[in-house]
Regions:
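Short amphipathic alpha-helices in soluble, non-transmembrane regions
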Residues: 2-8, 157-164
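Conserved active-site beta-strand-loop modules that form the wall/rim of enzyme catalytic pockets
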Residues: 88, 143-144, 170
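Short cationic amphipathic helices and targeting signals
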Residues: 38, 142-147
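Conserved hydrophobic/aromatic pocket- or pore-lining residues that grip, position, or stack substrates
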Residues: 107, 144, 161
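Extended amphipathic alpha-helical scaffolding segments in membrane-proximal extra-membrane regions
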Residues: 133, 140, 149-152, 157
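A cross-kingdom feature of multi-pass membrane systems that activates on extracytoplasmic/periplasmic
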Residues: 148-149, 158-170
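A structural signal for hydrophobic secondary-structure junctions
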Residues: 2-139
């Protein structure tokens, strides 16, 4: 993900574009285990939707120069795992070598969107954490999230975007 791709996608119907990467893991406490997906986002991520659904704490602040351990979890995960704002949570990952490794994160906030499938799975974290866990460099991402303006023909926008992205990225 770089400025070249971002400029290719400079279209009047696009509201925002963000690099994102995911990493599957397990949240483990003394009494519970819960499968999650870390959704790594960067400092420019548009938090407006999540902010409007924030029920306690704050949105984490990330920057390009350092890796943050701050995360945002859902109320569903917090309730199931008996976690709260300012708690440390250990998330376990399986590497390519099939070895497990745990990382400790600090819960900065709790959200509740009402979208059960998302709330059951996603923990927002620093994109640099997911890059490190995946062994990626600073330009690598899992996908890009494209938000369209209201009242845009999604099918037409999809067709335009599809032909603007280089084939090696599709």
């Amino acid at each position: 993900y770089d400025s070249t791709l971002k400029s290719r996608l400079d279209q009047p119907f696009i509201k925002s574009i963000f690099p994102v990467a995911n990493k599957a893991g397990l949240v483990k406490t003394d009494d519970e285990i819960h499968g999650v997906v870390l959704k790594g986002v960067d400092k420019d991520y548009d938090w407006s939707y999540i902010q409007s659904n924030l029920i306690s704490g704050n949105i984490p602040q990330y920057n390009d120069n350092e890796r943050s351990n701050d995360v945002l979890i859902s109320k569903i995960i917090a309730d199931k795992m008996l976690l709260d704002v300012n708690d440390e949570v250990r998330i376990w990952f399986v590497g390519e070598d099939m070895k497990t490794r745990g990382r400790k994160f600090l819960i900065k906030g709790i959200y509740e969107t009402g979208l059960t499938e998302c709330d059951e799975r996603f923990i927002y974290c620093d994109l640099n954490q997911v890059r490190r866990l995946n062994g990626w460099n600073e330009n690598m991402v899992g996908h890009i999230e494209i938000n369209l303006l209201d009242n845009v023909d999604v099918v037409e926008a999809n067709n335009i975007i599809y032909y603007k992205i280089p084939t090696n990225l599709i």
